[in-house]
Structures are given as structure tokens and as C-alpha cells.
């Protein structure tokens, strides 16, 4: 009896060891091997390149944040800054400009204009290239020269646009709060703001060249992130009755913002892969009568990936520029009180479902036009496939491929832009319905830009890591394809 009990206990412990401790030991060994590969990667050339780019990016961002709070030289004592901040802290237009400039607008800092003039100039030149066939032809035929020329033209346009914006801000925003305003003080402010925008442009270009991601997008991302503490302080300092229903409403609003983040990431990463047949590969298979399974065909299959949202977050930025910047500026500054135009614009319910509907339509229209003019050209796609002797199965080369890709882009873009617009207007609808204070940091444009930069930075870091990353699958352990053209040739 005792021997049976001892044998049973031994069997139980052996089972526990085989089922629990042995797999855990194996997992520890695998983790140790992965850690060694990670340490090897830390010493690799690719990660060394990432470290250099990351350090360069952080140093340039540090310069931007310092310049954000530097006052305009020689003008610190000539402005009633406290009154300027109090009167404009509840102005929606001023809050948006302050958000995109990282707090420099309400501080009347050296970098008040921020990166907006450079982004406007780049976008204007992109649209102009697609509108004028001569510019598009010049860009295709002389790519390197065109790239240098476009870069130069973008800088010139940035200076012109920054000068115009500086005049508007100086004479409309700053002048009423100046203690001793004269022409020379205004000229000094205009020159300082223009120079600040040029310095921001240079830093953004350097981040793009030696940093981790696009400099313009990264600077706006940093400015948005920098306003998070102020937005939280604004929320708690507002006159809110912190009851259970209000706390529940706030949690619901935050949950909708997180849902917006996940949906935007999904839209940016989703799409439809379309298989492409390359004539040379098919000819080799037919020449050697090579049998191929469906699994092997999937591994070697070439695809064209049509994104669900080819225009990205640009439609949201464009719509926000119209309804949050252009219209308020036009209403508040270009029209006089009591004018019939002022009363007409004021009669439109821009803070209701009508604005949300206009927002949705604008995003969808701009997304459709931007996708076909800036991002993807179906005619160029068809010409490239034809030059590579490739075709889409079931679609003839040439005009049919152009029509097919056009229709596919329209369908995917309609779905993606509609979902994007719906997700962007949903938080504002909930805020108005529940009476929550509006936080600029949780606005659709803020979330879209932040996530767009995060996704782009992740892609670039992954591309820099390359094949040396220990987290990628080891291609040497995959089963090789059952193809050997050399043996077939020798046999023949």
C-alpha cells in the first residue's frame, strides 16, 4: 500500500515537472537566447544609426522648445501680455493657434508662427505641381534637379507666407495690447516672427534629413504633446460640478477619444492587396513545367497595396483649417460688427450638427481629390505595370487597368474617408450633448496628427532595424521553395 502511494506521488511530481517546469526552463532558455540577440543588435550598425538619429532629433526638439518661450527681442516691456492672455484664452481660434505652436502664440514668443507657414508652402507647391502639367513633367523628367528646385521654391514661399502672417498677427492681434505702438515696433515684430518661422523651417528640414521622421509633422506632434498639462489644468480649473454623472460623462468622452485613436490607426494601416502577375516569372514556370502549390504561389506573389485611406490625415487638417481657423478669422476680423455679411455668417449654426455635417462632407471631398491628384495617379500606375510586363489578373493592361484602379481607389477612399469623418465628429457631438468642456488636446486634428507621426516614426525605425532585428522571424528556418532552375537546366 505504501509503495503504491510512493509510486503515485512520484508519477504526480514527474507529471508536474514535464508539464510545468520543463516548458518553463525551455522558455527561459529561449528568452536568454533572444536577450543575447538583442544585445548583439544593440551593437549593430543599424541601431547605432538609430541612436544617432534619435539624439539629433532630441537636440533639435530641445532648441524648438527653448525658442517657443523666448520673447521677441526688445519688445517684452511694450506689451500687456496678461490682458492679451486673459482675453484670448477662451477664443477658439487663438486656442487652436496656441495648440499648433506649442504655447508660443499666447506668449507672443519668437516661434509664434511655428511650422504652419512651411507646411502651407509645401502643400501649396504639391497642389500646384498636380495642377500645372509643365511642373509635373519637370518633376518626372529631371527628378534630382526638380527636387532641389522644389526645395528652394518651398523656402521662398515659406518666407513670403510667414511675412504675410506676421503682418496680420502684429496689426490685428498684438497691436491692441501694445503700450507704445508705432511703425518701427510693428516692423520689429514682423521681422522677428518671420525670422522665427524661417528658423523653425530649417530645424524641421534638419529633423527630416538626420532625424527619425518627418520634421514638420514631428514638430506639430511635440507642440500638441506639450499642451497636455495645460489642458488637464484647464479641465480641473473649469467650473464643473464633479458629480457622479459628470465623472461618468468625462470617462465616456475619454473612452471615445481612445476609440478614435484605435480607429485612425486601423484606417491608416488597412487596405486591399491586389495580386499582380509578372510575365517573366510565369514564362519561367511554363518553360520548365514547374509545379507550384497554392501556398508557394502566395509566398512568391507580388501585390499592389491600395490603402483604405490614401490621403491619410490631410483631409482632417484641411477641414479643421477651414472651420476652425479660416471661418473664425474671417468672421472676427475681416467683417465689421453689424455688417450684413457678419450677420449672415453668424446666422449659420457652426457649433451644431450643421457644422459637423459640413465637416464630414469636406473631409470626404478633399480626401477623394487629394488621393487621386497627390497620392496615387491611376494613369501612372497603369503605365508602370505595362513597362514591367505585369498585369492584374482579369484586367487588361492599359486603359482597363487605369479604370479598374480608379474605381478601386474611389471605393476604398469612400469607405475610409466616411469612417474617418464620422470618428472625428463623434467626440464633438458627445461633448455638446453632455455639456463637457472642450479640450483642444482631444480634438480630432490633434489625435490624427499625433497618431500619424507615431505610426510613421514606427515604420521608419522598423526600416532602419532591417534584418538584424531579433524580433523578426529567422528566414533561414523557413522551408525553402521547391524550385531549382539550375538542376532543371542541367538535366535538360
From Swiss-Prot:
SUPFAM superfamilies: Preprotein translocase SecY subunit. It is a multi-pass membrane protein. It holds the Pfam family SecY. Keywords: Cyanelle, Membrane, Plastid, Plastid inner membrane, Protein transport, Thylakoid, Translocation, Transmembrane, Transmembrane helix, Transport. Component of the Sec protein translocase complex, which is composed of at least SecY and SecE. Belongs to the SecY/SEC61-alpha family. This is Protein translocase subunit SecY. It comes from Cyanophora paradoxa. The lineage of its organism: Eukaryota, Glaucocystophyceae, Cyanophoraceae, Cyanophora. The gene is secY.
Amino acid at each position: 500500500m505504501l509503495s503504491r502511494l510512493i509510486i503515485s506521488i512520484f508519477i504526480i511530481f514527474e507529471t508536474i515537472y514535464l508539464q510545468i517546469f520543463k516548458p518553463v526552463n525551455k522558455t527561459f532558455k529561449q528568452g536568454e537566447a533572444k536577450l543575447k540577440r538583442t544585445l548583439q543588435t544593440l551593437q549593430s550598425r543599424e541601431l547605432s544609426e538609430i541612436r544617432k538619429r534619435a539624439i539629433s532629433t532630441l537636440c533639435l526638439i530641445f532648441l524648438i522648445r527653448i525658442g517657443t518661450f523666448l520673447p521677441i527681442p526688445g519688445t517684452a516691456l511694450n506689451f500687456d501680455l496678461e490682458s492679451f492672455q486673459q482675453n484670448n484664452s477662451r477664443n477658439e481660434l487663438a486656442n487652436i493657434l496656441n495648440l499648433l505652436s506649442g504655447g508660443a502664440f499666447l506668449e507672443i514668443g519668437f516661434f509664434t508662427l511655428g511650422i504652419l507657414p512651411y507646411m502651407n508652402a509645401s502643400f501649396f507647391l504639391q497642389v500646384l505641381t498636380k495642377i500645372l502639367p509643365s511642373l509635373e513633367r519637370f518633376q518626372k523628367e529631371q527628378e534630382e534637379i526638380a527636387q532641389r528646385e522644389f526645395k528652394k521654391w518651398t523656402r521662398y514661399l515659406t518666407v513670403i507666407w510667414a511675412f504675410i502672417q506676421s503682418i496680420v498677427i502684429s496689426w490685428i492681434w498684438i497691436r491692441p495690447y501694445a503700450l507704445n505702438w508705432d511703425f518701427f515696433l510693428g516692423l520689429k515684430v514682423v521681422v522677428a516672427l518671420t525670422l522665427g518661422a524661417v528658423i523653425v523651417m530649417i530645424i524641421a528640414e534638419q529633423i527630416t534629413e538626420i532625424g527619425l521622421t518627418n520634421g514638420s509633422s514631428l514638430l506639430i506632434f511635440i507642440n500638441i504633446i506639450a499642451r497636455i498639462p495645460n489642458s488637464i489644468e484647464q479641465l480641473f480649473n473649469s467650473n464643473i460640478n464633479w458629480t457622479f454623472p459628470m465623472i461618468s460623462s468625462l470617462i465616456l468622452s475619454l473612452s471615445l477619444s481612445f476609440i478614435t485613436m484605435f480607429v485612425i490607426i486601423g484606417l491608416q494601416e488597412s487596405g486591399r492587396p491586389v495580386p499582380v502577375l509578372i510575365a517573366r516569372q510565369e514564362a519561367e514556370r511554363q518553360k520548365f513545367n514547374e509545379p507550384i502549390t497554392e501556398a508557394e504561389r502566395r509566398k512568391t506573389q507580388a501585390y499592389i497595396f491600395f490603402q483604405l485611406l490614401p490621403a491619410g490625415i490631410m483631409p482632417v487638417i484641411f477641414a479643421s483649417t477651414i472651420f476652425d481657423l479660416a471661418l473664425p478669422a474671417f468672421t472676427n476680423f475681416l467683417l465689421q460688427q453689424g455688417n450684413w455679411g457678419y450677420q449672415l455668417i453668424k446666422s449659420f449654426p457652426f457649433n451644431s450638427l450643421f457644422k459637423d455635417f459640413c465637416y464630414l462632407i469636406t473631409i470626404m471631398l478633399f480626401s477623394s481629390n487629394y488621393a487621386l491628384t497627390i497620392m496615387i495617379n491611376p494613369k501612372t500606375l497603369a503605365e508602370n505595370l505595362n513597362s514591367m510586363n505585369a498585369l492584374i489578373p482579369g484586367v487588361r493592361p492599359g486603359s482597363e487597368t487605369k479604370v479598374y484602379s480608379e474605381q478601386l481607389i474611389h471605393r476604398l477612399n469612400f469607405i475610409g474617408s466616411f469612417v474617418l469623418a464620422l470618428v472625428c465628429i463623434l467626440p464633438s457631438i458627445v461633448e455638446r450633448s453632455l455639456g463637457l468642456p472642450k479640450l483642444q488636446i482631444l480634438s480630432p486634428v490633434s489625435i490624427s496628427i499625433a497618431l500619424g507621426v507615431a505610426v510613421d516614426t514606427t515604420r521608419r525605425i522598423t526600416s532602419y532595424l532591417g534584418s538584424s532585428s531579433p524580433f523578426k522571424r529567422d528566414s533561414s528556418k523557413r522551408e525553402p521553395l521547391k524550385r531549382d532552375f539550375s538542376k532543371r537546366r542541367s538535366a535538360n
